[in-house]
Regions:
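Conserved N-terminal phosphate-binding loop of PLP-dependent enzymes in the Aspartate aminotransferase
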Residues: 1-441
Length: 441
């Protein structure tokens, strides 16, 4: 039971200290109780200012908007409008889709998903307030289990299929009101979409006058090594959905959009909590601190080193499987490989580094191994998460303030947990995974 926390460290009621690499699901960009966040919140509380104002303008709101505009991609910042909505990312996505529907007169929404995962994606928030709209889900090239194969063929196939849908050439699917793009699909097991493919989606939507909605709920505010994940590919969206870390640890969500899409009245969203002054103050302080201290760049460099170390660990323990991510958004997907070959090789002598240690096709994900690894991490004082829709993926979301020394401590504890899981599995089954070997053609 946690009773105190500061930065990366959480202290339990028993006095034990934990390293928190879940960060409230990514909401704590600066870690627990960062001084700049606490100071900003105290300042509002001590001022006697109203804490909830719905759509009224306030100095706190103006300061948040001004700081947010400083961080936006240049192509959007100069003509951006900021719309506040309910504090959940689902409410922000609903508001963004409703805006696109009102601007285009169309109803449907297209979203991309890692469609070949074992677990189907959950429902996508859509439509305007109180309405429902059809959502068409298209596969994105994610290099693992995509129906279009791998490499360039995968990206080309996914792009051409998307173009067919957006042109209205697929029976039963009309031209959509908007296209939702998430540069790193966090809910879809930390899948990083190719930058080239993202640029092609941007060109495709622009050529057809279809608003591109960048969902930065999970990826924004420096998490991936750029302030906004779409900046890795140079994509400038028409609409951005922001939540999670944008509130500086407090509930806040906003929709940023081009001025020519400003077709709805300010009070179109009826959510009660869209004017939270404490969240706006904490959010403005967080945005400013990350910008001024270049924490996105820090996340890029340190995240790359963490990924390298984790891939080295996967080379020693093939069942660790796939290590992927960007910046400080990292996923580890344990798998059930065929261990007939030597360590670091797949069946039939597949070379080290082949996907999941398998020669012909990916090994199945092993949710049991991921859960066991999470438990062993916790026993060693390391808090990590599991994918919401894909519990076979271990998620690491440390605060952007994590130091190189702290990262080494995290990696040491994780490596120790891997060794413990491996030893137990081998003792009971003779295989590291404890699961059947990878299927062969």
């Amino acid at each position: 039971m946690p009773v105190r926390a500061r930065g990366l460290t959480v202290e339990g009621a028993d006095g034990r200290r934990y390293l928190d690499c879940l960060s409230g699901g990514g909401t704590l960009a600066l870690g627990h109780n960062h001084p700049v966040v606490l100071e900003a919140v105290r300042k509002v509380l001590d001022s006697g200012a109203p804490l909830q104002v719905l759509d009224l303008a306030t100095p706190v709101r103006d300061a948040f908007v001004a700081e947010l505009l400083r961080t936006l991609p240049p192509g959007l910042a100069g003509r951006a409008r900021v719309r506040f909505c309910g504090p959940a990312d689902s409410e922000a996505l609903t508001a963004a889709a409703g805006l696109a529907r009102a601007a285009t007169g169309r109803t449907g929404v297209v979203a991309f998903t890692a469609a070949c995962h074992d677990t189907p994606a959950g429902p996508c928030p859509h439509g305007g307030p109180g309405d429902a709209a059809p959502v068409t889900r298209l596969p994105c090239p994610e290099g693992r289990r995509c129906p279009f194969g791998g490499g360039e063929r995968e990206a080309e196939g996914a792009a051409r299929w998307a173009e067919s849908v957006l042109d209205g050439r697929v029976p039963g699917v009309g031209r959509p009101a908007g296209v939702v793009l998430e540069a790193v699909q966090d809910e879809e097991a930390v899948v990083v979409v190719p930058d080239g493919w993202a640029r092609r989606v941007r060109r495709t939507t622009a050529d057809r006058s279809i608003p591109l909605i960048a969902d930065e709920s999970h990826t924004g505010v420096g998490r991936t090594g750029a302030f906004w994940a779409v900046e890795h590919s140079g994509v400038t969206p028409d609409v951005m959905v922001l939540s999670q870390a944008v509130g500086g640890s407090l509930p806040l969500a906003v929709v940023v959009h081009r001025d020519d899409l400003d077709v709805l009245p300010r009070d179109a969203d009826r959510s009660t909590f869209r004017g939270n002054q404490l969240a706006m103050a904490a959010g403005a302080a967080t945005l400013a601190h990350i910008r001024q201290n270049r924490l996105a760049r820090h996340a890029a460099g340190l995240g790359a080193r963490i990924l390298t170390r984790l891939r080295e660990l996967a080379g020693r323990f093939p069942w660790v499987g796939d290590v992927r991510g960007r910046g400080l958004m990292i996923g580890v997907e344990p798998v059930a490989p065929d261990l007939d070959g030597e360590a670091g090789t797949g069946p039939s002598g597949a070379p080290a580094g082949a996907p999941y240690g398998c020669a012909r096709r990916p090994c199945p994900a092993a949710a049991g191994l991921a859960a066991a690894l999470q438990r062993e991490c916790l026993r060693r004082g390391l808090i990590v998460g599991l994918g919401a829709r894909h519990p076979g993926v271990l998620r690491l979301l440390p605060p952007l303030t994590i130091t190189a020394e702290q990262a080494e401590a995290v990696l040491d504890r994780l490596a120790d947990a891997v060794e413990a899981v491996d030893a137990v599995a081998r003792h009971h089954t003779g295989r590291a995974s404890g699961l059947p070997p990878c299927p062969r053609d």
